[in-house]
Structure formats: structure tokens, C-alpha cells
Amino acid sequence: MENKRNFFITIALSILILALWQVFYLGPKTEAQREQARIEEQQRQAQQAAQNRQASSSTGDTPQMPANPDSIPGQGDTKAAGAPLTRDAAIAQSPRIEIDTPSLRGSINLTGARLDDLYLKKYHETVSDKSPEIELLAPSSLKQGYFVELGFTGNDATGAVPGPNTVWVVEGNNKLTPSTPVTLTYTNDKNLTFKRVISVDDAYMFTVDDTIINNGGSTVSLASYGRVTRFNQPEHASATYVLHEGLIGVMGQDGLQEIKYAKIKDNKDISFKDVIGGWVGITDKYWAATLIPPQDEKFTGRFSHFTNDRPRYQSDLLSAPLTVAPGQSQKIQNRVFAGAKVVNTIQNYETKYHIKQFDLLIDWGWFYFITKPMFYLIDWIYKFTGNFGVAILVVTVLLKALFFPLANKSYKSMARMKLMQPKMTEIREKYADDKMKQQQAMMELYKREKINPLAGCWPVLVQIPVFFALYKVLYVTIEMRHAPFFGWIQDLAAPDPTSIFNLFGLLPYTVPHFLMIGVWPIIMGITMFLQMRMNPTPPDPTQAAIFTWMPIIFTFMLASFPAGLVIYWAWNNTLSIIQQSVIMKRQGVKIELFDNLKGLFRRKPKEANK
């Protein structure tokens, strides 16, 4: 019975790891390749920009604004990018306001008051601080154009209201910093004056205060709209199923909406009307751009896909109509989040501005009730250790302590089973020809000795959701991105960069990706091998072969996992070996580890010739 239990545990673990390998290895591998291609393309564009900063081309944005203010904005940019432009050339096409904060740098395009030029100062493409800063938003005339825009929709009575082609006028300060907001104005032919004050904090939140002043002779009705628009699907978006990348939003009572790029291609348009409380945007793994309307007022939210001359993905919202009588004014405030999805920053924004479920901008996954607390625990310990890798080691010890009663009961049951081995062998020999009686006798023995043959499964089953949760923390939280451990591990969220097949860098050649078996995966495999050798070798040859090969298979499969996860697994195995040794010793059971290791190198005696 014990051998069957071990066999089933082995098969279950093998299936689990095969599934994990399919999801976590193939996806991140493709993502890494595409990310490298994207970095190389950006570097090529930067070099081209340095050679030709005077290049320019007209790429006007001409959305079709609806006549009915109750309608969501139309398709928007319908013109193709035209001749390829460098980023510098695209930015030089329009007058701009500089953005300079501790976290951001870039500019606001005065044509449309569009936020389409934004870099994240604190984050780089690679672990090197000398590598390029992360480019979040880009002008629409570029192939990967990505921007945020706020405007108005009106009718004949309102005249031309601010839209994507409106050129705003700057009043006073022309540099946006946390201490210096900027003011933009626009007056149309109906004597409607629009005054926009844009402010920004030290992190990633822009506040846009719009005032509409009616100096005309008739009452007007108009609505405020906002849109987050991205041209072309990012290369990394379909790399993995582990997290959501694409259009996202919270739509009041309808809750979180996650729309993959492929899904919106099929549906074209997904709308939510009369929403109170929520937000819309587009999210990547670590970064996002979102629009946040007043949380106590109705709005219409929409996710769209347009083809036209090039694919365009859009999350937008439309406010309820605003009525402005002659001589009166109306105000509306919207916010724009554009930056890194730092957990505490997102949580603080949700609390400060009462943004409905803004924390769901971070994809915590199915085990969010484990993943989120685990992140906060790791982050809290990090404040004392100053190293996320050490924090993971400490959390592993705490988890071992938390599940000690379960593990203790399991190991005690396993120890008693070892003590019962002589009786179990006797039963097998006695009923060798009658499997039914053999099983009945075994069950009676288990019941009499209070042994649970499946007790060893529980520590494994408990570890599975913890494994997934820790993987999710390492994979989606930006705090773990480029977080170093010690020595050669400079990014806990990336695989171990070394490989035994080039002697860990001593031999001057690049190893194929599937042979990148680093130091930590090897350490993990050794600890797994030792843990399995704590128990006697199964008498069945098939089971014995599986137990022998499992550590090797796990070593290859986990080599592509984040280094932080492999370190956790190796450390967890080490603690399990220590824990099991102590419990077995207390139960008076012989520890088989050294005998089993010696048995591997002991020559089997040859059968005597008859």
C-alpha cells in the first residue's frame, strides 16, 4: 500500500510539473525572446533618431466626433502612420509641455492635450541602470503608438469642442512638475471657454480638472470623454496565459473586466452603460495606463477594436451629459494613472481617491487570497532584511512552522508505517496468491496501528497552492522585477542565468535555452534527490526508476522558472529533510538516507551458476 501511495504521489507530481512546464516555460521563453527583439528595435530607432532629428511627416489624427453628446467617441485616428518616423521626429511635430517628476519624464502634446510621450525614470529595460528607461507612452504616428486623451463631445449648439485636433493654449507655467500644475485654455466660435488644469503627483497619477464656461447666449449640452488608445498589439501580449495583458476595467456592479487582444478582435465592441464607480485602461505585465472618472457619477465604458489602416485597441469612457446655461460654468474632474503597477502605490490610490477595486489592476490570479497576503508578508520581511531573496527564505521557514502540525502528523504516520514494514512483508508473503485478502489484512493493520497510508500526500497537496501563489508573486509584481539575491542572481523574477553545459560561463560559447541548467536548479535537484532517498527504495522496478529520474526531470523543468521560485523549492526541500529526520529519530525509526546512498554505488552480486 505504501508503494502504491508513493507511486500515485510521483505520478501526480509528474503530471503537475508537465503542466507547469507547458504554461510557465513555453510562455516566458517566448516572452523573453520578444522582449529582447523589442529592446533591439528601440535601440535601432534611437540610433536612427540621432542621425536624423529633422525628419517630419504629417500624420493628423482625425476622429469622427459624434453629433449626439450621449454617444461614445467615434473611431478616432483613421489615418495610417505614413512614412516611418523616429520618436524624436514624431514628438517634434507638435508644440509640447515638458513633464518632469521623480518618477516620470516626457511631454504633453498640446494638439489634443494628449499624453503620448512618457518614460518611467525608475525602471530600465535590463538589470543595468545604463540600459534605456522604460518607454510607456508613444505618439500615435509611431507603429507602437500608445496614448491617453481627454476631450468633449457636443452638437451644433456647442460648436467645435476640444477633441484630438484641438490646439490648446498654455497659460503661465509650461513645465508640469508635482509642485507646478499647468493650465490650458481653448475658446470656440460659440463663446464656450474650456479651461484645463493638469497636475501630477510624485508617482504616476495625473489629475485633470476641466471647467466649461458658457459666455454665449444659449444653453449647451456636452459630455466629457476619455480614451486610452494603443496601435498594434504589443509583441509580448500573447506570450503567456499566466497573467492578463490587454484591455481592462472595473464597470460598477459588473466588476472586473479583462479583455484579451484576441477577444476584442472577435467582438469589436463591448460596452457598459450607466456605470457608477470604476475605471478603464490598458495593462501590460508591469505597466498600465488607465482613466478614472468621478466615482459617484454615471459613465459609459467601452472596449473597442478598429482595423482601418492599422489595428487599434481602445478603452474609453463617456460621462453623463453636462448642461451649461449662459453665464454659468460646469466642472468635471478625471484622473489618469500612467506608470508602474507598484502594489502599495496602487493600494494607496484606491484608498485615497476611493477608486473602485483599483487593486485589481494587478493580476493576483485564482489564488489571490493566498497570493496577495504572501506578497505583503514578503514585502514586510524585506523591510528588515533588505533582500527579497532572504525574505523568501524567511517566509518559507514561517510556512513550515505554520504547517508543522500537518507535516508532523504526516511524518509520524510514515514513521509508523516503516516500523510496520516487517508485519506488512509478512502479510504480503502470507497472502501472495490472494490480493483481496492481502488488501483486507493491510487495512486491518492500518486501522489497528492508527496509520493513514495517504498521510504523506497532505504536505504535497498543501504546497501546490503555495507554489502557485509564490510563482504569481514573482511573476507579476514589479517589486520582484530585477530584485537581486546574492552572487550571480541579479533578478529573482528571471531564470538562473548560468549553465552547467558551459561550466557556468567558463567555456566561451552560448548554450541553447533548453540546456540552461543553472546552479540553483542543480541544488534544487540534489535536495529533492536527498529527500526522496530518506525512504527505502520501492521494490517495484518501475517505481524505483521513477523515483530515480524524478529529480533529474524536475531539475530540467524548473531551470526555466524564476530563480526565486527555484531557491524557495531548494530551501523548502532542505527544511523538509531536517524536519523529517528529527521526527523519524524521535519515533525510533532508522533514517535510510545514508544506506540508500551507499546502495546506489554498491555492486549487485552476480547470481551463482546452477
From Swiss-Prot:
This is Membrane protein insertase YidC. InterPro entries: Membr_insert_YidC, Membr_insert_YidC_N, YidC/ALB3/OXA1/COX18, YidC/Oxa/ALB_C, YidC_ALB_C, YidC_periplasmic_sf. One of its GO terms (biological process) is protein insertion into membrane. GO terms for molecular function: membrane insertase activity. HAMAP family: YidC_type1. It is a multi-pass membrane protein. Belongs to the OXA1/ALB3/YidC family. Type 1 subfamily. The gene is yidC. One of its GO terms (cellular component) is plasma membrane. It is found in: Cell inner membrane. Required for the insertion and/or proper folding and/or complex formation of integral membrane proteins into the membrane. Involved in integration of membrane proteins that insert both dependently and independently of the Sec translocase complex, as well as at least some lipoproteins. Aids folding of multispanning membrane proteins. Interacts with the Sec translocase complex via SecD. Specifically interacts with transmembrane segments of nascent integral membrane proteins during membrane integration. The chain crosses the membrane at residues 7-27, 358-378, 387-407, 458-478, 510-530, 546-566. Disulfide bonds: none annotated. Residues 44-55 have a biased composition (Low complexity). Gene3D superfamilies: 2.70.98.90. It comes from the Bacteria. Residues 36-82 are annotated as: Disordered. PANTHER family: CYTOCHROME C OXIDASE ASSEMBLY PROTEIN COX18, MITOCHONDRIAL, OXA1. Keywords: Cell inner membrane, Cell membrane, Chaperone, Membrane, Protein transport, Transmembrane, Transmembrane helix, Transport.
